[in-house]
UniProtKB/Swiss-Prot annotation:
Name the UniProt record assigns to this protein: Metal transporter CNNM2
Gene3D superfamilies membership: CBS-domain, Jelly Rolls
UniProt similarity note: Belongs to the ACDP family.
Keyword entries, A-Z: CBS domain, Cell membrane, Disease variant, Epilepsy, Glycoprotein, Intellectual disability, Ion transport, Membrane, Phosphoprotein, Primary hypomagnesemia, Repeat, Transmembrane, Transmembrane helix, Transport
Intramembrane feature spans: 314-334
Length: 875
């Protein structure tokens, strides 16, 4: 038996070598491992020393083997390369299935066979808790105090049979990891190492056993060999030798194909989003409008889109379903590539917002018609693809929400749309006004556009169609004139200007004759009648003028119809075109604002159609003239045949300025021109009322009474003259002419031819007319009246339109003189007498009728004288 002393030197040597070698690999380990690795290294060194001491008990051959083949000690592992599938996590190695991983092995005496001393097991190392110790007795031997055998080595991790050495302290091995079992997401494996050499032979074992048995009393034949007599796998200390195999990260598709799909899905997402905005914004009404009035390209686009857009809910469901499907798929593919949910969400959100929402919607909102028409085939394709899901939902929406009609604008919205889009459309202001006026026609009433009754031009039914009346009608410029009786609100007839085409102003035709002959119907409307209804009435041709009335039920009494004004077709048209229609005769631009028309260069002047001064200005009927003549001759002493011949009276009444008319205005009743006489104001004329009414105020008490036709005033004014003495009529007879008159036989000059014309009687230079010497007494009588002035003590004011006779004192005195000249007998000596009458220039001029009257009288006188001389010569 080999004693232990024989082995002692070798044990010492082995211990010394181990002790000497331990610092070497410890320093190497410290340089490459962490603090935890250094702890594992010290524990491994503590285990090696007992093994080395036990090996000294072996035989000489055993000791020699130990000295020649030193034990390989594995300290730890780490990943050579890290990536997405192989990395360190929490001190453990994390790798993926179906991969090959390179590991760097740290330890002592790393050689080409080291790969065979490494294995992995699925079973975790068992650790005893302190409670497992016996109570009151010695502690049982702890397995953790020495090497602990590892469980069954796994076949899921294969150590490839090669190693790359590096200075015998580290090496690189490669392992292959097989797939995990079904339903396993991850699995943990633990590192196991082999510490003992291969088992010895029988003799060796017996010797060793005998030595040990002899030493310790247990090395007898038949006992099982010690654990280190064969290859023993033990757990490696330290958590850093734990390996976690995770599920292999599988891509749904190859990376390049996924990139293509992601790009395509982004395009589809943008298309669905853009079409959803572009097509759904084109409502069916707008598409119909574009089909009818758009350009050729727009008509083509609308024609292609309209059948699809007509199925609004079906199209909406298809586009939304496709958009959601595309966006969801895009997120899944991005998550598969990124490997992180947060990254996938951020990237997909950015991509969808920019390329799937903002850009396509910005384009389709402006060019939706073109984009929708060019992608109509894709739209139809996806509508067919999503038909099973989208069509039932669309039908449900049709039942719940009803059929889509489209955008419909009412009158107010359409007007506002025109106003808002005015800067962007090509409508001119006049066109826009006409459109607005036509749309507002139903919202306005005739009361808004009518001409109030107080501003209407109207004619009384008692009017006479003389020159003044017809001139007033023509100057008004209206073609349809209401005719009233009594009050202006009592409109009884309607006069058309064309009805006066065959009326002669000289005939003084009564207005009633014309209105009764034509009998134009009156059209009454209520004040709340809309303008569109009024336009329809005017279009029927019944009338282009209507009388606006309302039911007045204010106050006590029964309701009655109150006339408010007049509305015409022109008023309605002006509201439609939002502008005033002006013609040549308009005086105002607006019948409501009363803004006058600007001054026109050409004005209508009807003076060319007036009668001359020699004509009667006011036409009266022959019957009225006869009645007036007989009344003055029989009822008024100043015009009796004893004072004035009937012939001269008739000529006086036919004088143009004798018969006059006065138009009465109800608005200005107290105007001075309506007073024929005023109290305490001198007058020199006589007045006879023919037609109309006057009011007479007489006496200090101011008694008033009304008078009508054939009442006369101012008889005393005919015998009293307010004319100054310088302007009075004077009779001058030259001395030579008086002497010639005294001796008629001496006058041998031929008689002056008769023929005092109009120019001679009114000439400023020739103021003397011939008179006979026998008028001396009359001359004295006339001169005696020059100092008399007539001042009435009463007032006469018109109450209506008047037609009256106005004879001034000058006209009366001329008529008296003409009458006396007509009555005075002519002598034979008057043929050589020249009598000239000086007349002042009257304020209204000497009438031609008086001059003709004097000419006729002189002609008669001279003809008688010539006739007597002719008879004497014959004798």
């Amino acid at each position: 038996m080999i004693g232990c002393g024989a082995c002692e030197p070798k044990v010492k040597m082995a211990g010394g070598q181990a002790a000497a070698a331990l610092p070497t690999w410890k320093m190497a380990a410290r340089r490459s491992l962490s603090a935890r690795g250094r702890g594992i290294l010290q524990a491994a060194a503590g285990r090696l020393l007992p093994l080395l001491l036990l090996s000294c008990c072996c035989g000489a051959g055993g000791c020699a083997a130990v000295g020649e083949n030193e034990e390989t000690v594995i300290i730890g592992l780490r990943l050579e390369d890290t990536n997405d599938v192989s990395f360190m996590e929490g001190g453990a190695l994390r790798v993926s299935e179906r991969t090959r991983v390179k590991l760097r092995v740290y330890g002592q005496n790393i050689n080409n066979e080291t790969w065979s001393r490494i294995a992995f097991t699925e079973h975790e190392r068992r650790r005893h808790s302190p409670g497992e110790r016996g109570l009151g007795g010695p502690a049982p031997p702890e397995p953790d105090s020495g090497p602990q055998r590892c469980g069954i080595r796994t076949s899921d991790i294969i150590i490839l049979p090669h190693i790359i050495l590096n200075r015998r302290t580290s090496g690189i091995i490669e392992i292959e990891i097989k797939p995990l079992r079904k339903m396993e997401k991850s699995k943990s494996y633990y590192l196991c190492t082999s510490l003992s050499t291969p088992a010895l032979g029988a003799g060796g074992s017996g010797s060793t056993g005998g030595a040990v048995g002899g030493k310790g009393g247990s090395g007898v034949a038949g006992l099982p060999p010690p654990p280190w007599a064969e290859t023993t796998w033990i757990y490696h200390d330290g958590e850093d030798t734990k390996m976690i195999v995770g599920e292999e990260k599988k891509f749904l598709l190859p990376f390049w194909l996924q990139v293509i799909f992601i790009s395509l899905l982004l395009c589809l997402s943008g298309m669905f989003s853009g079409l959803n905005l572009g097509l759904m914004a084109l409502d069916p009404m707008e598409l119909r409008i574009v089909q009818n009035c758009g350009t050729e390209k727009e008509k083509n686009y609308a024609k292609r889109i309209e059948p699809v857009r007509r199925q609004g809910n079906y199209l909406l469901c298809s586009l939304l379903l496709g958009n959601v499907l595309v966006n969801t798929t895009l997120t899944i593919l991005l998550d598969d590539i990124a490997g992180s949910g947060l990254v996938a969400v951020v990237v997909s959100t950015i991509g969808i917002v920019i390329f799937g929402e903002i850009v396509p919607q910005a384009i389709c909102s402006r060019h939706g018609l073109a984009v929708g028409a060019n992608t109509i085939f894709l739209t139809k394709f996806f509508m067919m693809m999503t038909f099973p899901a989208s069509y039932p939902v669309s039908k449900l929406l049709d039942c719940v929400l009803g059929q889509e009609i489209g955008t419909v604008y009412n009158r107010e919205k359409l007007l506002e749309m025109l106003r808002v889009t005015d800067p962007y459309n090509d409508l001119v202001k006049e066109e826009l006004n006409i459109i607005q006026g036509a749309l507002e026609l139903r919202t306005k009433t005739v009361e808004d556009v009518m001409t109030p009754l107080r501003d209407c031009f109207m004619i009384t039914g008692e009017a006479i169609l003389d020159f003044n009346t017809m001139s007033e009608i023509m100057e008004s410029g209206y073609t349809r004139i209401p005719v009233f009786e009594g009050e202006r609100s009592n409109i009884v007839d309607l006069l058309f200007v064309k009805d006066l085409a065959f009326v002669d102003p000289d005939d003084c035709t009564p207005l009633k004759t014309i209105t009764k002959f034509y009998n134009h119907p009156l059209h009454f409307v209520f004040n709340d009648t809309k303008l569109d209804a009024m336009l329809e009435e005017f279009k029927k041709g019944k009338s282009h003028l209507a009388i606006v009335q309302r039911v007045n039920n204010e106050g006590e009494g029964d309701p009655f119809y109150e006339v408010l004004g007049i509305v015409t077709l022109e008023d309605v048209i002006e509201e439609i075109i939002k502008s005033e229609i002006l013609d040549e005769t308009d005086l105002y631009t607006d019948n409501r604002t009363k803004k006058k028309v600007a001054h026109r260069e050409r004005k209508q002047d009807f003076s060319a159609f007036k009668q001359t001064d020699s004509e009667m200005k006011v036409k009266i009927s022959p019957q009225l003239l006869l009645a007036m003549h007989r009344f003055l001759a029989t009822e008024v002493e100043a015009f009796s045949p004893s004072q004035m011949s009937e012939k001269i009276l008739l000529r006086l009444l036919k004088h143009p300025n004798v018969i006059q008319e006065l138009k009465y205005d109800e608005k200005n009743k107290k105007a001075p021109e309506y007073y024929l006489y005023q109290r305490n104001k001198p007058v020199d004329y006589f007045v006879l009322i023919l037609q109309g009414k006057v009011e007479v105020e007489a006496g200090k008490e101011g008694m008033k009474f009304e008078a009508s036709a054939f009442s006369y005033y101012g008889v005393m004014a005919l015998t009293a003259s307010p004319v100054p003495l310088s302007l009075s009529r004077t009779f001058v007879v030259s001395r030579t002419e008086l002497l010639a008159a005294g001796s008629p036989g001496e006058n041998k000059s031929p008689p002056r031819p008769c023929g005092l014309n109009h120019s001679d009687s009114l000439s400023r230079s020739d103021r003397i007319d011939a008179v006979t010497p026998t008028l001396g007494s009359s001359n004295n009588q006339l001169n005696s009246s020059l100092l008399q002035v007539y001042i009435p003590d009463y007032s006469v004011r018109a109450l209506s339109d008047l037609q009256f006779v106005k004879i001034s004192r000058q006209q009366y005195q001329n008529a008296l003189m003409a009458s006396r000249m007509d009555k005075t007998p002519q002598s034979s000596d008057s043929e050589n007498t020249k009598i000239e009458l000086t007349l002042t220039e009257l304020h209204d001029g000497l009438p031609d009728e008086t001059a003709n009257l004097l000419n006729e009288q002189n002609c008669v006188t001279h003809s008688k004288a010539n006739h007597s001389l002719h008879n004497e010569g014959a004798i």
